[in-house]
UniProtKB/Swiss-Prot annotation:
NCBIfam families: squalene_cyclas (TIGR01787). This is Lanosterol synthase ERG7. It is found in: Lipid droplet; Endoplasmic reticulum membrane. The active site is at residue 482. Pathway: Terpene metabolism; lanosterol biosynthesis; lanosterol from farnesyl diphosphate: step 3/3; Steroid metabolism; ergosterol biosynthesis. It comes from Gibberella zeae (strain ATCC MYA-4620 / CBS 123657 / FGSC 9075 / NRRL 31084 / PH-1) (Wheat head blight fungus). Induction: Expression is also significantly higher when CYP51A is deleted or in the CYP51B/CYP51C double deletant. PANTHER family: LANOSTEROL SYNTHASE, TERPENE CYCLASE/MUTASE FAMILY MEMBER. Belongs to the terpene cyclase/mutase family. The gene is ERG7. It is an enzyme of class 5 (isomerase). In Fusarium, the biosynthesis pathway of the sterol precursors leading to the prevalent sterol ergosterol differs from yeast. The ringsystem of lanosterol in S.cerevisiae is firstly demethylised in three enzymatic steps leading to the intermediate zymosterol and secondly a methyl group is added to zymosterol by the sterol 24-C-methyltransferase to form fecosterol. In Fusarium, lanosterol is firstly transmethylated by the sterol 24-C-methyltransferase leading to the intermediate eburicol and secondly demethylated in three steps to form fecosterol. It comes from the Eukaryota. InterPro entries: SQ_cyclase_C (IPR032696), SQ_cyclase_N (IPR032697), Squalene_cyclase (IPR018333), Terpenoid_cyclase/PrenylTrfase (IPR008930).
Amino acid sequence: MVANSTGRDASALKSRKRAADSESEPLLKQGQPFPKQPRIGSELDKTRWRLKDDDSRHTWHYLEDDDAAKEWPQSYAEKWYLNQSLDLPDLPSPDSPLAAATNGLDFFEKLQLPSGHWGCEYGGPMFLLPSVVITWYVTRTPISPSKATAIYNYISARAHPEDGGWGLHIEGESSVFGTLMNYVALRLVGVEADDPVLVKARGTLHKMGGALYAPHWAKFWMGVLGVMDWDVVNPVPPEIWLLPDWVPFAPWRWWIHIRMVFLPMGWLYSKRWSCEETDVIRSLRKEVFIEDYAKIKWTSHRNDIGVVDNYHPKSWLLNTANWLIVNIWNPYLRPNVLKEKAEAWSSKQVDMEDANTDYACLAPVNATMNTVMCYARDGPDNYGVQRHIERLEEFLWVKDEGMLVNGTNGVQCWDTAFLIQAVFEAGLHKDEKWKPMLMKSLQYLERQQIREDCVDQDVCYRQPRKGGWPFSNKDQGYGVSDCISEAMKAIILLQKVGGLPEVLEERRLFDAVDTLLLYQNSNGGMSSYEKRRGGEWLEMLNAAEVFGRIMIEYDYPECTTACVTALSLFNKYWPDYRTKEVKTLIRTAAEWIKSNQRPDGGWYGSWGICFTYAGMFALESMKHIGQTYATGENSRRGCDFLISKQRADGGWSESYKACETMEYVEHPSGSLVVQTAWALIGLMEADYPHVEPLKRGIQLIMDRQQPNGEWLQEAIEGVFNKSCMISYPNYKFTFTIKALGMFAKRFPEEKLVPSWALQGNGIEKS
């Protein structure tokens, strides 16, 4: 494929436009009835799915027309996402770790998308797809048969093999949240109640107490859908947004993901807006409860919650506040003028979020709620509603199992930056073969830098973002400390070390540094989206129940390390720019990382699983302040912790349970290549002196590599809010290539080969 300077696929643009137009569903029309439920097919032809990469805006299209399918051939990337054969020849059997890294890059390079980045599913949470389906339903948005079938296939494939329910995420045990939401989603896309998948799931839901034991977010969605009465939903008072900013629990102090959800949720709660009753909704009222719907006393079930769902029980403070709002404030004291003022302010905040992201929104959780709010407020003909429906498509992803919803609109900038760094660690940037790939990546990151602050930044409580990079793309528009750092490192390496043209001038790197310096908290640690604004006691107001550490920004060893390493690299080439501030941040941030180390030598990770992930980053930070295994106690204890977890086969294995329990837990499936790579990278960053443990880990990575250069998917890699896991499938390339390259650079005399390449006393080339 040929990409032009904008990142759009020029060679296929015409045929893609025609194909996309022929497949897309009609937009909403004023006063239209509920669309007919789509016809669920038995199977879809995976060779007809196409991913449109509009400079990292991803949309999937199912091509019914044979000519359209021929005009828009399926790429290697699309085939890989769908688990189709790429028909690639086996590569020469690697005779060294560097050769294995080269083979891995040879495969991964073929997955680069036309605009220069790498895409992938970012799935895992099992409540996101149902939220989109409910949003489509209540806004009367037609669902094509191909979408409905793909959704049915995915949800069915992810049902628990024993009880048929669904959990909070794909590896979790069945919960009321997951089971109720996915049950409802299947019914809304046209699956009949007597379908075997739903019969089994309904039995599990009833055994857990039925829908009344769903957590807060599920009850909210059931209120929107009209399956439950709003009296069952614990309060989401929009009036809290009218509090003065100095109030210690004012919502501008909350973590961005919770306050962006609270805004549309509060508006809809205050309006008590529900979808018009339909036959499906009436049927659901009979199916998801074990009680007679007409006899349910909704207010008495506000606090009912399933055992599995109740990860973060409501505090006495929150329960007291909820009781006062429900029993005193709402019925007796709440003046209508204040209610309307709070709704108007929440509505304005939602509009600012939509404007600052061109309706892409922070993530699908608030995107779906914003869509419903705008529909309820403005009606279907409103431009904002139409644009919301259009942009929801960018959260959808198709894989071999079917259609899911990603946790954001992608991981484009994040994964691209890591791949670039891996190439440099392996020294592969010196090979002319990879220059076109690297140049496309550089141009992509250049285009995705955020060039301006938000409109009315102070009014909508947004952190300055000019010069930053997002997790996904600039449309989403949220700078994140580690995303800024990793992208900045990648660009400096490409332009200063790799000798590529300077497509991003130094003034724009200075903008990135200016923004990055704003993320440090008073204790030296670095947050994710914003500098911390409130105290940890605000977790007493955590109403989500299924998540932990959700109310405020925290300090993260991963984010802190990214900032330390990026600013260290920046200072090497621009030693005179804000020298004092840069060096002070590096020093104080590294001191925080030291203080965050646990007595056993590990660091707790908040964005990857878990101690292995954080340990890799923390040990890299220590290296940048001159501390290694030989020279520093923190590095030595960190290495000893990782070595103590190495398995007999040379690998590392950590379960998502470690994130929940905050204690190291091995994954039942055994060693995992991604966590093995993380551990090895951390050990090598710390100059761990004993080569044998490193060799054993490298051997496992080489043994798991396939003859065509790829690694196969294993356990889930990422996490957020302690309890919800999320997939990073590209990690099995970026970090394995990096680990292999680092080992080859440090130990060039070690000529390891994969076990599968050995025959007798020699090595057989495939």
